[in-house]
Curated annotation (Swiss-Prot):
CDD domains: FH_FOX. This is Putative forkhead-related transcription factor fkh-5. Its main location: nucleus. GO terms for cellular component: nucleus. It is found in: Nucleus. It comes from the Eukaryota. Residues 171-262 bind DNA. One of its GO terms (biological process) is regulation of DNA-templated transcription. Disulfide bonds: none annotated. Keywords: DNA-binding, Nucleus, Transcription, Transcription regulation.
Length: 461
């Protein structure tokens, strides 16, 4: 009998009947069902069956000591609005959202707020519960707003399908990825490197990879996994996360990785064999990380010591480079850099929004103008060309400041930069065409070189 009564009542559940001008909204097991408003005239026999079924159904739950479902009566007979579906935005993009209702469509405020809070939080995994706020009419629900610090420097991002890689007639250096990874490891302060540091090191010193297909990065990862000359370490720290690589025998790199063909490539390099001797001795160092985290790895055509130097010089004058603002950077593809850059000592810090949200965390910010100077500075087109052309003078200034133990030697004062770099004359054609003849002296020296047999040459002789 109880089962039959239950079936009868379940068949008429979710129906609002205007019997005595009353409406019922029924929710069952914490799930809000749709409210259906029916305005019709029932026969007396049907009304009697509904009343009796409802009465027996309540009696059954009371006798069996079960929990009654939640019923709430509306304050208006023409209420036909379903319960609101609260919409959430993503947690990282919380924005205020509000849902308003008229006074004729509201429940009793206290019961309604409790009901909505319970409805949205039960059987749902959320990091934080919905906070319900009320206005003066008690008719508004506001999703809380999460305030995030906007980064001062945004990471450059260019979709791969829109990347236009320029074709340059540059010969690929005959250096194995195994050797390039080993050279990166030798110049690391702690002897450990990540794949990101290898990419930055290669882009910084070899112009060919700035215009090559990015599949070379897959080859680097493959070599690191298969090569038995590297140890793979798991590091969980503030600076590095994931796999890092370390040479097993750093003193045997010349014997194990440099053959006659590789030595001949080093001899033909415009920077000379001395450049590779310094690399094997760990006297070159790694490129500065923030530039490659923001610009260099995403737009490799702007990698290199020249663009890295002007990036930090702009930061030293409190100039924040806008996203994808390429006016300050030039492509240096005609010749390799002469390797006049000083050796920097920086701890590897990966890019994060929290890192660049505060100026105190940005390396070299404001060091060129000094404390107490709030003026904003920028570079003209002529000054940008002049800086790139006279990059040797800028590197020499850095080395002199380092010898004098200046704390800001990596980004010298603007006064020194103006005297040593900006005041030098440049050719008018360079300003008009926007091109720079890189290392013309190095070209002449390369043409005059008389190479010996690579098999008879030791890299240290």
């Amino acid at each position: 009998m109880q089962y039959a009564l239950t079936v009868i009542f379940q068949s008429i559940l979710f129906v609002q009947c205007q019997v005595g001008e009353a409406a019922f909204v029924i929710s069952q097991e914490h799930e809000v069902s749709k409210s259906i408003s029916i305005n019709m005239t029932l026969f007396p026999s049907i009304k009697w069956i509904i009343h009796k079924s409802f009465y027996l159904y309540l009696t059954y739950f009371v006798m069996s000591q079960q929990t009654l479902p939640c019923f709430q009566a509306a304050d208006s007979y023409n209420y036909s609005h379903s319960l609101p579906k609260v919409q959430f935005a993503r947690f990282s993009k919380y924005t205020p959202q509000s849902i308003s209702y008229s006074s004729t469509q509201m429940y009793q405020q206290k019961e309604y707020s409790d009901h909505i809070t319970e409805m949205t939080n039960v059987h749902k995994s959320r990091k934080r519960k919905l906070m319900v706020t009320e206005d003066q009419w008690g008719s508004q629900i506001t999703i809380p707003k999460v305030i995030q610090n906007r980064p001062l420097i945004e990471k450059w991002f260019v979709q791969k399908r829109f990347k236009m890689v320029k074709v340059r007639n540059i010969q690929r250096p005959q250096l194995s990825y195994q050797l390039l990874s080993a050279l990166t490891c030798l110049n690391s302060p702690d002897g450990m490197i990540s794949t990101t540091e290898i990419y930055s090191f290669i882009l910084h010193h070899w112009r060919y990879y700035r215009y090559a297909n990015e599949n070379w990065k897959n080859s680097v990862r493959h070599v690191l996994c298969k090569c038995q000359l590297f140890d793979v370490l798991q590091v969980e720290g503030l600076s590095r996360k994931g796999n890092v690589y370390k040479l097993k025998r750093p003193d045997n790199v010349e014997k194990e990785m440099i053959d006659v063909k590789t030595l001949g490539c080093m001899q033909k390099d415009s920077r000379g064999i001395d450049f590779y001797i310094k690399m094997l001795a760990g006297q070159i160092g790694l490129p500065r990380h923030l530039f490659y985290s923001i610009v260099g790895n995403e737009m490799p055509e702007y990698a290199g010591p020249e663009n890295s130097a002007i990036f930090y010089h702009l930061l030293s004058m409190r100039k924040i480079i806008p996203k994808l603002e390429t006016r300050y950077f030039l492509e240096h593809w005609q010749m390799e850099h002469k390797a006049t850059e000083p050796m920097f000592f920086e701890e590897f810090v990966p890019y994060s929004t929290s890192l660049v949200s505060c100026v105190e965390n940005i390396s070299s910010y404001g060091e060129g103008v000094g404390p107490g100077n709030d003026e904003l500075y920028d570079l003209s087109d002529r000054q940008i060309i002049c800086f790139h052309k006279n990059i040797r003078a800028y590197h020499s200034l850095q080395k002199r400041c380092h010898k004098m133990n200046y704390s800001n030697w990596m980004t010298p004062s603007l006064i020194y930069v103006q005297e040593a770099v900006m005041d030098k004359e440049i050719v008018e054609d360079d300003i008009r065409n926007g091109t720079i003849e890189c290392e013309g002296v190095a070209r002449k020296e390369e043409a005059k070189k008389n190479f010996q047999d690579p098999a008879l040459i030791s890299i240290y002789n």
